[in-house]
Design a protein with these regions (language model features):
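Extended beta-strand/beta-hairpin segments
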Residues: 1-35, 46-124
Length: 124
């Protein structure tokens, strides 16, 4: 089952539930929430690090969520793993950028705090 939604800025997004064997997989609404959390924080972190003149070869965020057992099922625990790649990375600046994102700038993070315990890890 699939649904198309149009965001306020006019972008079309297809969401739904994929069954085993589906050739046209779609993201579930809950999976999109985790993706939104990662992108929100990632945008902050990259912007802050650019202002700090930190050069990265690559940057990735993995998010993992644990759902409650009872309905309505929602994420009650989320692990965010920040992975930074490059030579001579300034770990203090990276820690500061991640901290600013998770404590000050990322609005999606603030929304998640209302219902989930969020843990973060930084990997170099």
């Amino acid at each position: 089952m699939k649904f198309e939604t149009i965001s306020p800025n006019g972008v079309s997004i297809t969401l739904g539930s994929s069954q085993d064997g589906d050739t046209n997989k779609v993201a579930s609404p809950k999976a999109l929430m985790l993706s939104s959390l990662a992108v929100c924080s990632g945008l902050d972190v990259v912007s802050i690090l650019e202002k700090m003149k930190v050069n990265l070869e690559d940057f990735k965020i993995n998010t993992k969520g644990s759902l409650t057992d009872e309905h309505p099922k929602y994420y009650n625990k989320v692990l965010m793993q920040y992975h930074f790649f490059g030579e001579d990375l300034d770990q203090e600046k990276i820690k500061k950028a991640v901290n600013l994102s998770i404590t000050k700038y990322c609005g999606v993070m603030e929304m998640f705090r209302a219902f989930a315990e969020i843990k973060t890890e930084i990997h170099y």
